[in-house]
């Protein structure tokens, strides 16, 4: 039974999963839109939205908290100074997932994940 199981394991160890989500987050911040598998996109959505909510405050502590999660100065600065202010009047729902195709090699469902505004 999977009662009250709060996240997808994505077939990885906990540290590998954390690194994967961090790298996908940096990629979406830098590019604005990425294509990945549907389960990864669904798991990434919550991770990114929590970071944006934290970055919306825009103060020094928010900047530090975002950097602690990402460990990437360029992505942190872009998130806090460019992306988060766009969502100042929006309470959640900062990203959208669009199903795109079935990947030919392994029949995995693929999806785009992008920022809404």
UniProtKB/Swiss-Prot annotation:
Keyword Ribosomal protein: yes
HAMAP family in UniProt: Ribosomal_bL17
Molecular function terms, GO-annotated: structural constituent of ribosome
Matches recorded under Pfam families: Ribosomal_L17 (PF01196)
UniProt KW keywords: Ribonucleoprotein, Ribosomal protein
PANTHER family with a match to the protein in the record: LARGE RIBOSOMAL SUBUNIT PROTEIN BL17M, RIBOSOMAL PROTEIN L17
Keyword GTP-binding: no
Gene Ontology, cellular component aspect: cytosolic large ribosomal subunit
Family affiliation: Belongs to the bacterial ribosomal protein bL17 family.
Name of the protein: Large ribosomal subunit protein bL17
